[in-house]
C-alpha cells in the first residue's frame, strides 16, 4: 500500500473522530470559543511534532519565503474559517448530516484545482466527483 494512501486513510479516521469528539465536547458551550481552544491545542501539538523531529530550525526558512508564507497564511485563514463553520454546524446539527456536507470540500477542491491550478482529471475522476456530491447529499438529507 502506498504511503500517501495510508496517511490519507489515517487522516479520514482522525477527521471522523473530530466530528464525534467535537459534537460531544460542544454541548452547552460556545462553538467559536471551543474552536479557538482546539486551535491552540493543535498548534501546541504540531510545534511539539516539529521539535520532536528536530526541524525547528526550518521555521526561519519557511518564514523567509514570502510567496510560501502568503499562501500558508491564506491556508491558515481558510482553515480557521472552516473550523469555525464546522463547529457551529456540529453544535446545531447532527454529525450524520454535517460530516457528509463538510466532505463536499473534496468536490470543491477538485473543481478549484482544475480551474486555478490547471490540473487535469479523467472522466472516471469526474464521475467520482459527481458520485461524491450525490452521495454526500443523500447521506446528509436521507
Question: What do the predicted segments below correspond to?
Answer:
Residues 1-13, 29, 43-72, 83-92, ...:
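Membrane-interface interhelical linkers
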Residues 6, 10-13, 37-41, 70, ...:
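Hydrophobic residues within alpha-helical transmembrane segments
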Residues 12, 16, 20, 47, ...:
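Hydrophobic/small/kink-forming positions within alpha-helical transmembrane segments
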Residues 17-42, 97:
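Juxtamembrane helix-loop-helix junctions in multi-pass membrane proteins
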Residues 25, 34, 89, 115-117:
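Hydrophobic/aromatic residues within transmembrane alpha-helices
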Residues 46, 124-141:
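Hydrophobic transmembrane alpha-helices of multi-pass small-molecule transport proteins
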Residues 53-54, 117-118, 142:
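Short helix-capping/hinge motifs at transmembrane helix termini and TM-loop junctions
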Residues 106-125:
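C-terminal transmembrane-helix exit sites in multi-pass transporters
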Amino acid at each position: 500500500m502506498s504511503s500517501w494512501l495510508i496517511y490519507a486513510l489515517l487522516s479520514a479516521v482522525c477527521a471522523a473522530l473530530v466530528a464525534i469528539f467535537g459534537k460531544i465536547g460542544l454541548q452547552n458551550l460556545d462553538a467559536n470559543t471551543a474552536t479557538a481552544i482546539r486551535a491552540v491545542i493543535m498548534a501546541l501539538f504540531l510545534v511539539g511534532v516539529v521539535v520532536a523531529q528536530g526541524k525547528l530550525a526550518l521555521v526561519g526558512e519557511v518564514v523567509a519565503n514570502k510567496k510560501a508564507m502568503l499562501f500558508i497564511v491564506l491556508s491558515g485563514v481558510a482553515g480557521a474559517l472552516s473550523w469555525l463553520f464546522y463547529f457551529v454546524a456540529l453544535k446545531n446539527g447532527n454529525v450524520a448530516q454535517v460530516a457528509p456536507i463538510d466532505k463536499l470540500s473534496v468536490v470543491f477542491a477538485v473543481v478549484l484545482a482544475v480551474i486555478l491550478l490547471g490540473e487535469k482529471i479523467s472522466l472516471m475522476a469526474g464521475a467520482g466527483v459527481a458520485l461524491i456530491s450525490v452521495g454526500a447529499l443523500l447521506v446528509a438529507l436521507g
